[in-house]
């Protein structure tokens, strides 16, 4: 809905628009549901009121959460901004999840937890990305210590245990992830630390890792790998 970075892809559907109605028709026909709306960046000058359109459209799509990241160096202001976004989202029965990333100001699991707790909003939570957790120096044990009510959603992928040789964490995150089971991330321990109510998703952009695959084949490979991995853990 909103580009994750300047110039990035986005599909800004507006409430009661032709595009949104067509999307709803296709959702109804296919059985696909929308969980979260991406992606807001909480900068020092962020104004939640400018994104009422996003919450309105999300409500029409039946979404449950809005995802954001934090890029404000002032923790108190960042928490106030997050709280304001939670209040606006709450008017439409939506929650808000903060996703921490090593290269952002809200960089670690602790940063995200501090922000959510400081904001003090019941519909505020954390979006846990397995890659970001490990690349930011986090561990499954640290994740297990987080009150589970804050762990609203999680994104799974895999990666080598070692850091990117060129130090480019952004490119790795956006173009070079592995499907679950093809890397060395402690996915089993990460999933075990989540709440049974945590919504699981796959985030496996692999345009650098598998540029020859069509998007539908990338999606199928990721889903098949995740199914295989999750089923194996139940045995």
Label every model-predicted segment.
Residues 1-5, 42, 71, 159, ...:
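Flexible loop residues that form catalytic
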Residues 12, 16-19, 47, 74, ...:
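Residue-level preference for long, well-ordered alpha-helices that form the structural scaffold
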Residues 4-10, 43, 208-213:
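A short acidic, helix-capping loop that chelates divalent metal ions and anchors anionic groups
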Residues 28, 59-62, 109-128, 134-235:
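Histidine-acidic metal/acid-base catalytic patches
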Residues 9-10, 38-40, 69, 177-181:
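The substrate-binding groove and active-site-proximal loops of carbohydrate-active enzymes
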Residues 1-22:
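Glycine-rich, proline-tolerant flexible connector loops at the mouths of alpha/beta enzymes
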Residues 20, 26-126, 135, 233:
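Active-site acidic/histidine proton-transfer and metal-coordination neighborhood
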Residues 1, 35-37, 66-68, 154, ...:
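Hydrophobic residues within beta-strands of alpha/beta enzymes
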